[in-house]
Amino acid sequence: MTLPPPADFVVAIPARYASKRLPGKPLQRIGNRPMIQHVAERALLAGARAVWVATDDARIAEAIAHLPGVHVAMTGTAHLSGTDRLAECARIAGWDEQTCVVNLQGDEPFAPAAGIGAVADLLQHSGAEMATLAAPVDSAHDLFDPNVVKLVRNARGDALYFSRAPIPWHRDSFASQRDSVPAEGQWLRHIGIYGYRAGFLQRFAAMPPGMLERIESLEQLRVMEAGYRIAVAVTPEPFPPGIDTPDDLARAQARVASA
């Protein structure tokens, strides 16, 4: 059996300084390095042809300027989303429409390299317009936490829906207790890493938000509501959560300190 060749891809990391819940998040130090450096190094380990950091802040650009293989796209300050920022990055970088772009969030300092590469491979071989990852939900807290996005897939592995609500809704189990994950069924949490061709990235950024995106505040629903496919793979190894709050940062710092 001949295995398909690994995907050729670039990684683009949107990074803005003005995070509401954790100001200056990309520059917060984890161990002896800023968070954005950890993320860029994970992308390089994944085998990306190039890594780009898309930012509107010179301090973030300076923090990774010394890393070989990492480029900086200085983007505008008015972008409403990371997708908009990456669309500008793609134009600055001059990627052709078929370039495989993996969008790695700037707050994922422990992203497994295998997971990043898996998104690129899934995009290449699935035929879908977008690709992303999921992981099993292992706690009732995550299942009912609206900050943990859940998803359901069809038999082909394409996303049917993303929601902040616990989906699928277990009618019998959830009616009586919500302190454990039901044994029957599979609940998946979304991991916010995306793969798409550079041409589709431009179309995505140009689409107006749909009703579902406005209700759930989930940008990927814009793609589904417009009728495009999002292929979803279950991550091949545990995927630590990203860093959104000061408590998340403290846990990440403790993890590195104890390693």
From Swiss-Prot:
Example GO BP: CMP-keto-3-deoxy-D-manno-octulosonic acid biosynthetic process
Pathway involvement of the protein, from the record: Nucleotide-sugar biosynthesis; CMP-3-deoxy-D-manno-octulosonate biosynthesis; CMP-3-deoxy-D-manno-octulosonate from 3-deoxy-D-manno-octulosonate and CTP: step 1/1; Bacterial outer membrane biogenesis; lipopolysaccharide biosynthesis
Pfam families associated with the record: CTP_transf_3
Enzyme category, top tier: transferase
InterPro entries given in the database record: Cytidylyl_trans (IPR003329), KdsB (IPR004528), Nucleotide-diphossugar_trans (IPR029044)
Entry's family note: Belongs to the KdsB family.
Function, in words: Activates KDO (a required 8-carbon sugar) for incorporation into bacterial lipopolysaccharide in Gram-negative bacteria.
Protein name (Swiss-Prot/TrEMBL): 3-deoxy-manno-octulosonate cytidylyltransferase
Source species: Xanthomonas oryzae pv. oryzae (strain KACC10331 / KXO85)
Record lineage: Bacteria, Pseudomonadati, Pseudomonadota, Gammaproteobacteria, Lysobacterales
